[in-house]
């Protein structure tokens, strides 16, 4: 079994405030954390935004839901976006008021990370994993940390890692770097080779490499390409490896891109979700030091397309009832 069998549940309180009542597969209302735990989930992933306008996904929001997760026996994986909003390959907007020169920005990032980690510890939350940035293939904290300036990226990540290492968190979490397109070895190799050759970010600064792996953004995102890429990553850097975001649709009438060849026979249904997640988990398990799989936001039913061209990638019905696919976490 994988060490980390997880889901991202960041939007749980947003949905509860919108009136969603989550139900288990039998139709009985229960807190989402209990439904997840009963279906084999052992870790929840949570995105942290620095100062979002409405407060959703800020540190206080995350501490509140992390306490619920901990009470349900779940581990917590904190995903720092280092932005006031979404951070991904198309968006890495520096938080409002942060300095843009590299010296002051490095200190700001270190101190922000240190302070957030200490606040988690003081609240009784000891995350098992902390990601320093989210999908940072194109860098982080733009414009200073764009890939045109690898030296800045290396310095920023070193500062973030040491914010965790110097914190009062005990025990210390695994520190992760997270890129998208986990199937693309060329991209992973280009990125890590460039950032590590700067000499500032050391291999000892981090423990895990996380990747996103979605089937609906490129026909090149085959399961076989994922396996090859993760095998190469493990062989080259000897880090723990996890697929930290993935989805499979229960409805996808008008996909924008052709699906990868080796998943085309998988149906768009809860049964298909079970098959796809099992296949991805088997690949991670087959990789040296492959340790985890996280499904992205399976309970965000008011945003069911989850940013894709597929109509619904969640593992809950629109009325909030868990689908049969949620139990896949008992078997990976």
Curated annotation (Swiss-Prot):
Transmembrane segments: none annotated. Its EC number is 3.2.1.89. Coiled coil: none annotated. Keywords: Glycoprotein, Glycosidase, Hydrolase. The active site is at residues 135, 245. InterPro entries: Glyco_hydro_53, Glycoside_hydrolase_SF. One of its GO terms (biological process) is cell wall macromolecule catabolic process. It comes from the Eukaryota. GO terms for molecular function: arabinogalactan endo-1,4-beta-galactosidase activity; glucosidase activity; hydrolase activity, hydrolyzing O-glycosyl compounds; polysaccharide binding. SUPFAM superfamilies: (Trans)glycosidases. Glycans are attached at residue 111. It is an enzyme of class 3 (hydrolase). It catalyses: The enzyme specifically hydrolyzes (1->4)-beta-D-galactosidic linkages in type I arabinogalactans. PANTHER family: ARABINOGALACTAN ENDO-BETA-1,4-GALACTANASE A (PTHR34983:SF1). Belongs to the glycosyl hydrolase 53 family. Has a pH range of 5.5-8.5 with optimum of 7.0; and a temperature optimum of 65 degrees Celsius at pH 6.5. This is Arabinogalactan endo-beta-1,4-galactanase. It comes from Thermothelomyces thermophilus.
